[in-house]
Each structure stands twice: as structure tokens, then as C-alpha cells.
Design a protein with these regions (language model features):
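C-terminal amphipathic/interface module of NAD(P)-dependent oxidoreductases
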Residues: 259-291
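Mid/C-terminal beta-alpha module of Rossmann-like enzyme folds, strongest
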Residues: 206-207, 212-257, 289
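NAD(P)-cofactor binding segment of oxidoreductase domains
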Residues: 82-110
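Rossmann-fold cofactor-recognition segment
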Residues: 42-52
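NAD(P)H-binding glycine-rich loop region in Rossmannoid oxidoreductase-like domains
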Residues: 50-90
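Catalytic helix-loop patch of NAD(P)-dependent Rossmann-fold dehydrogenases
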Residues: 89, 93-97, 117-158, 164
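N-terminal Rossmann NAD(P)H-binding glycine-rich loop of SDR-like oxidoreductase domains
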Residues: 4-26
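NAD(P)-dependent short-chain dehydrogenase/reductase
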Residues: 146-195, 201-202
Length: 291
């Protein structure tokens, strides 16, 4: 029996790499990357500039995928704030073009959005909460969510929380946290930034669940609302380190290009009902480190 084709953008990125691994069980996976010399076992790697409209159109027509997961993004809020044109080209224009081509093929397109579409003033946020971004990254993700839905009735928005884990071609914040602690250096962490984090492995499973179940919007946060500082305390526990190295601070103490919402905890009750099963932060960290 011929397996269906799944096209994943951002395959060399943190989330995309986890998606490629998880999707191979049920799909023939084709992964878009923005550079050559990348090997992801078990998938067909397709180098492409997603901002090149004609190249993307040709690829979609040649590949004829059965579904698409759009995980490629400029995802660092400070970088987006400092480079608005680049952010718009990748996070908005490329997303809308991809949704248009998926609409023409009448196939589902899962879009990985973010908890940064909210202002942090009324958590926790469920799927029906009004969007209210306070930084450019969030604004561009809102534009992409809306525009993709207009271009493809089969578009599925997955709003992602803070994610952590290990991937060969991209890092999450976890590596820098762990490296700092293991080097015996102090680690400053915000007490006033609250998220609902999950591992990259868990996030990938949630996105594939969304593709299978087909809701128009799904939040994929974890079960715990936790600050970065308290996350650090759990990390220290898992790594058998010392909390002495942790230094509490607030967002106002660190100059940043992009404003940050204080509490963008996601209410992921709908995903839980559909079978999404993220573990506690401690359990997820133990899984990441193979403990």
C-alpha cells in the first residue's frame, strides 16, 4: 500500500526535526530546508527558499503532497522586532503562499503559530480567546493565521508554547541553560514570564494529532504554568545541580528589542480531550535527558 506524502517545512529547525522523526511512522516525509548538506534519516530533504513564490509553487506542483505542516519560521521575537521585513517575508508572505497552494490542491495545511499572539493579561488562553499581540513576531503570526484560513478552508492552526529539547541542527533554550549550569556559572531567569512548556517530542505528537483530528485551531501547551525561574529549579533537580547558581530577575532588568507578554499560559483542554498527553515539566526533562 502506497503511503501518503507529508511535506514539512523547517525540517532542519528544532520543531521541524522532531516532526520529521515522529511522522515517519505513518507518512512518506519530505522536508524543506533552507540550506544544503543536511541529512535527516528516513526523509527526503528538499532545499528551497520558501520566500521564492515561484519555486515554492513549482515544488508543490511537482511533489503533490497529501498534507503539509508549516513549521518554518523566524521564531525569535527580538530578531523579528529588529528585522521586520525579513520577519514578514518568512512568517507572513511565505505562509500565505503555501496556504494558497494547499488550497488549490485541496489538502490540509497545519500552521505552527505561537502563544505570543496573546498579550499576557488574561491567562490562561483557550482557542476562542481574542488575539492581542504586543510584539512583531506575534503580530505577524496573527496575520498568517488569518490569511491562511482565508486561502485554505483546510488550514489548521496549532498555537505552540515554549518548547525545549535537543535537535542536531537547531537549539532550544535548554542547551544554553544546561551548559551554563554544568559550567558552574550563574543563570539569570525571569520570575515574571509564565508559560506552559512542553518538549519538542511532545509538541510534534500534538501537531500530528491536530492533522489527524482536523480542528481549525488547537492549543498545545503543557499541563503546568511555570516561570522560567521555576523551570530552572526543575532543571537543576533533574541534573542534580545546585539552585545556588539560579538568579531571579524580571523582564524589565534585561533590555530586549521585543516586548514580552508576562503570562501566555495556554489552556489546552481541547487537545487533552483529543488525546494529547504532555507530561509534567520534570517528566518531560527526564525524557529529554534519557533519565
Amino acid at each position: 500500500m502506497t503511503r501518503k506524502k507529508l511535506f514539512i517545512t523547517g525540517a532542519s529547525g528544532f520543531l521541524g526535526w522532531h516532526l520529521c522523526g515522529a511522522a515517519q511512522l505513518d507518512w512518506d516525509v519530505y522536508g524543506a530546508v533552507n540550506r544544503n548538506r543536511i541529512n535527516i534519516p528516513g526523509i527526503t530533504v528538499l532545499p528551497i527558499d520558501l520566500t521564492d513564490r515561484s519555486s515554492l509553487k513549482d515544488l508543490m506542483q511537482d511533489l503533490q503532497p497529501d498534507a503539509v505542516i508549516h513549521a518554518a519560521a523566524l521564531s525569535r521575537p527580538n530578531d523579528c522586532q529588529s528585522n521586520p521585513d525579513a520577519s514578514f517575508a518568512v512568517n507572513v508572505r511565505a505562509s500565505l503562499n503555501l496556504a494558497e497552494y494547499c488550497g488549490a490542491l485541496e489538502i490540509p495545511c497545519v500552521f505552527t503559530s505561537t502563544d505570543q499572539v496573546f498579550d499576557g493579561l488574561n491567562p490562561p488562553y483557550n482557542e476562542s480567546a481574542p488575539v492581542s499581540p504586543i510584539n512583531l513576531y506575534g503580530e505577524h503570526k496573527v496575520l498568517a493565521e488569518k490569511g491562511m484560513g482565508e486561502r485554505n478552508s483546510n488550514a489548521i492552526v496549532c498555537r505552540m508554547p515554549l518548547m525545549f529539547g535537543v535537535a542536531p541542527y537547531a537549539e532550544s533554550f535548554l542547551q544554553s541553560f544546561a551548559n551554563t549550569l554544568q559550567a558552574g556559572q550563574p543563570l539569570k531567569l525571569f520570575t515574571d514570564e509564565i508559560r506552559t512548556p512542553v518538549s519538542g517530542q511532545t509538541a510534534a505528537q500534538g501537531i500530528l494529532l491536530a492533522l489527524k483530528q482536523g480542528p481549525s485551531c488547537l492549543h498545545l501547551g503543557g499541563p503546568e504554568r511555570i516561570s522560567r525561574y521555576d523551570f530552572g529549579k526543575v532543571l537543576v533537580k533533574v541534573l542534580n545541580g545546585s539552585e545556588v547558581l539560579l538568579q531571579a530577575c524580571q523582564q524589565a532588568d534585561v533590555p530586549m528589542a521585543a516586548p514580552r507578554p508576562s503570562d501566555v499560559s495556554l489552556d489546552s483542554s481541547l487537545a487533552f480531550k483529543l488525546g494529547y498527553r504532555p507530561g509534567s515539566v520534570e517528566a518531560e526533562l527526564q525524557r529529554v535527558f534519557g533519565l
